[in-house]
Amino acid sequence: MIPLSIRVPASTANVGPGFDSVGIALSLYLHVVVKEKSDKWQVIHSFEDSIPTDDKNLIVSTACKVCPSLSPHIIEVTSNIPLTRGLGSSASAIVAGIELANQLGKLNLTTDQKVQIATNFEGHPDNVAASILGGTVIGALDGKNVSVVRIESKELGVISLIPNEELNTDESRSVLPDVFPFHEAVKASAISNVLVAALCQKKWEVVGEMMERDHFHEPYRLELIPLLPSIRKCAKEFGAYGTALSGAGPSIFILTPYEKRQEIAEQLARVFTSMKVCELEIDHRGITVNKKEHIGL
């Protein structure tokens, strides 16, 4: 029997113009299983060698920052969230670390506290809030204060096109401008406002239109993801609502009518053969914890 297990969903961020604010939880998952106490932290995983197996692992280091008095444990980590592909892999690790500290340290953190802590670590609420809450989230970080609203989007299907190449978030952010002209900011924020209103009112065609009209980041990142325009064109022809970069990229995120997601995914897979086409769903549960026979930890 598993003593303690934690499951954290992947996430996509921005949804076009909702830069560092809008996030959606996805049906790819990071799992953490706590095995037993140990004299030092040990992380069992089958990822690449660059992922630490000790207290330098992001999950463990996050947990120890949240609760420095934690006793070391052996944990096993598995995940089908692609690394450095714009699907919230680091955010899911941060969220898992916070929950690990919460459970082992008996901190009794509220959901709002978890979102606040995770946002402070990540620097923006979109990915981490989606992974904690599930569904679609709209968040804002003002200084140290985080405000998040969660909405349901059960009528939507999701497709992700994942390239073989990695793209580091820092590299993707390096192409963004340091200064944004006032008139461009007005235009960009208006589009983002309509996106959020359309999400809340379930006006999916408007959502699709707005998510393809971003001015904040996608125009600058096109040089790093040159296939985006052709994928966007094909997806629309196949019946999708809209297409955008997933987070900082390089993955592409597509919203579809729920009942058409499989058909559209199959059509895209036939065209873009160099990319992995994943038919996904929006995760509506967020982080989950299984504490069966969690004794003596």
Curated annotation (Swiss-Prot):
Disulfide bonds: none annotated. The keyword Iron does not apply. Its main location: cytoplasm. The keyword ATP-binding applies. Keywords: Amino-acid biosynthesis, ATP-binding, Cytoplasm, Kinase, Nucleotide-binding, Threonine biosynthesis, Transferase. Its EC number is 2.7.1.39. Pathway: Amino-acid biosynthesis; L-threonine biosynthesis; L-threonine from L-aspartate: step 4/5. GO terms for biological process: threonine biosynthetic process. ATP binds at residues 82-92. One of its GO terms (cellular component) is cytoplasm. One of its GO terms (molecular function) is ATP binding. It is found in: Cytoplasm. NCBIfam families: thrB (TIGR00191). PANTHER family: HOMOSERINE KINASE, HOMOSERINE/4-DIPHOSPHOCYTIDYL-2-C-METHYL-D-ERYTHRITOL KINASE. Catalyzes the ATP-dependent phosphorylation of L-homoserine to L-homoserine phosphate. Belongs to the GHMP kinase family. Homoserine kinase subfamily. This is Homoserine kinase. The gene is thrB.
